[in-house]
Curated annotation (Swiss-Prot):
Gene: Acot2
Species annotation: Rattus norvegicus
pH dependence (record): Optimum pH is 8-9.
Superkingdom of the source species: Eukaryota
Lineage: Eukaryota, Metazoa, Chordata, Craniata, Vertebrata
Catalytic activity annotation: hexadecanoyl-CoA + H2O = hexadecanoate + CoA + H(+); tetradecanoyl-CoA + H2O = tetradecanoate + CoA + H(+); octadecanoyl-CoA + H2O = octadecanoate + CoA + H(+); eicosanoyl-CoA + H2O = eicosanoate + CoA + H(+)
InterPro entries, per the entry: AB_hydrolase_fold, Acyl-CoA_thioEstase_long-chain, BAAT_C, Thio_Ohase/aa_AcTrfase, Thio_Ohase/BAAT_N
Protein name: Acyl-coenzyme A thioesterase 2, mitochondrial
SUPFAM superfamilies for this protein: alpha/beta-Hydrolases
Catalytic residue positions: 273, 365, 399
Pathway info: Lipid metabolism; fatty acid metabolism
Enzyme class: hydrolase
Length: 453
């Protein structure tokens, strides 16, 4: 299907490159000028499948037809986030002998990426504003992606041959979004479109607080009831996280277990970064946590005290002399936390847990030593006769392992540090990690919460 919505294009505020018709640009065949072949306008069309909309974690089929045989072209893609920040990518290609370009078969010859990367125009996007992370704030509205085909291999100089817009949604058709204000609990519950009951998951993000819903909303389209849970800096919750009381998270667990559309009896936890650390603490202190996925989490309390009833876990010490400066002027804090093997009181008591764990680890995580933490958690669990957790490590993947096709955020502001730090990762291997991790965590939760293989 050829995407063709000028109304959406105008609304996206992305169209900065003119308004000539892109659906069918006609002209003479290639001309020979002094031994150099040039390509004039063609009847090029840019086709996307699915056509005008898809979910963010779905792959796109991108095809250009009506080009001249072996015509060199540049494809570029752009989107704006809710704050107006521009993200874009481009790649150079060559049409086949029939004048067709299929990104599933044609390798990129250069640009933001190279090689056979059908989704490279999405995952390789970079922010125009330095150190800016793509974060979806409103899952009820899509990202609008503009794609263009330009003649030649100059990303800003070639004549536009075709253009399309495509909506990337974060809620599959029929997914239900239910705001939750129950006691102290502040959250949003996402339910699949079909009748329940459903296996249930609590989803936790990291430092920065607020309520991020995009991972929960996408997972609800996979058959899970997912509660995106805020725990600070949101609504009437505490503005800081000096003390994390697990009783708050216990309230959230009890709310979800009592919901009429959840299957029970056990709950799944999904947490990244600080959310992974809190997931480990919840699994250690609370009953009914059947399965937990920890994405680049810490096995020690970091930056704040963790409390449950009369127990207190102090944060690990900071080693300020271990902070380094990169050649790009960023702080590297990967060595800046004392080992929980030294600060033993800061080690979260995972040995108390009866939870089945999956650790997803970026081996180039520079936020902290995620692989070390996962392996130390595994050692402690096994030393106490508990089930050996699964650990999946991703070479050259950084800290923020997101749902598929999110661009890598390799550096940015760390609110606890108060400065820009490196988060690690390389774009291509990080994108591979995100795609695999997304499938791994779904398979894990389906098996542990529903008994599906």
């Amino acid at each position: 299907m050829v995407a063709s919505s000028f109304a959406v294009l105008r609304a996206s505020r992305l169209c900065q490159w003119g308004w000539k018709s892109w659906t069918q640009l006609s002209g003479p065949p290639p001309l020979s000028t002094g031994g150099r072949t040039t390509f004039a306008r063609t009847n090029a069309t840019l086709s996307l499948e699915p056509g005008s909309r898809s979910c963010w974690d779905e792959p796109l089929s991108i095809t250009v037809r009506g080009l001249a045989p072996e015509q060199p072209v540049t494809l570029r893609a752009a989107l704006r986030d809710e704050k107006g920040a521009l993200f874009r990518a481009h790649a150079r290609y060559r049409a086949d002998a029939g004048g067709e370009l299929d990104l599933a078969r044609a390798p990129a010859l250069g640009g933001s990426f190279t090689g056979l990367e059908p989704m490279g125009l999405i995952w390789a996007m970079e922010p125009e504003r330095p150190l800016w992370r793509l974060v979806k704030r409103d899952v009820q509205k899509p990202y609008v992606v503009e794609l263009e085909v330009l003649d030649g291999h100059e990303p800003d100089g070639g004549q536009r041959l075709a253009q399309a817009v495509h909506e990337r949604h974060f809620m599959a058709p029929g997914v239900r979004r239910v705001p939750v204000r129950d006691g102290r609990v502040r959250a949003t519950l996402f339910l699949p479109p079909e009748p329940g009951p459903f296996p249930e998951i609590i989803d936790l993000f990291g430092v920065g607080g607020g309520l991020l819903e995009y991972r929960a909303s996408l997972l609800a389209g996979k058959g899970f009831a997912v509660m995106a849970l805020a725990y600070y800096n949101y609504d009437d919750l505490p503005k800081t996280m000096e003390t994390m009381r697990i009783e708050y998270f216990e309230e959230a667990v009890n709310y979800l277990r009592g919901h009429p559309e959840v299957k029970g009896p056990g709950i799944g936890l999904l947490g990244i970064s600080k959310g992974g650390e809190l997931g480990l603490a919840m699994a250690s202190f609370l009953k009914g946590i059947t399965a937990a996925v920890v994405i680049n989490g810490s096995v020690a309390a970091v930056g704040n005290t963790v409390c449950y009833k009369d127990e207190t876990i102090p944060p690990v010490s900071l080693l300020r002399d271990k902070v380094k400066m990169t050649k790009d002027g960023l702080l590297d804090v990967v060595e800046a936390l004392q080992s929980p093997l030294v600060d033993k009181k800061s080690f979260i008591p995972v040995e108390r847990s009866d939870t089945t764990f999956l650790f997803l680890v970026g081996q180039d995580d520079h936020n902290w030593k995620s692989e070390f933490y996962a392996r130390e958690a595994s050692k402690r669990l096994q030393a106490h006769g508990k089930e050996k957790p699964q650990i999946i490590c991703y070479p050259e993947a950084g800290h923020y392992i997101e749902p598929p096709y999110f661009p890598l955020c390799s550096a940015g502001m760390h609110l606890l540090v108060g400065a820009n730090i490196t988060f690690g990762g390389e774009p291509k291997p990080h994108s591979v990690a995100q795609l695999d991790a997304w499938q791994q965590l779904q398979t894990f939760f389906h098996k542990q919460l529903s008994g599906k293989s």
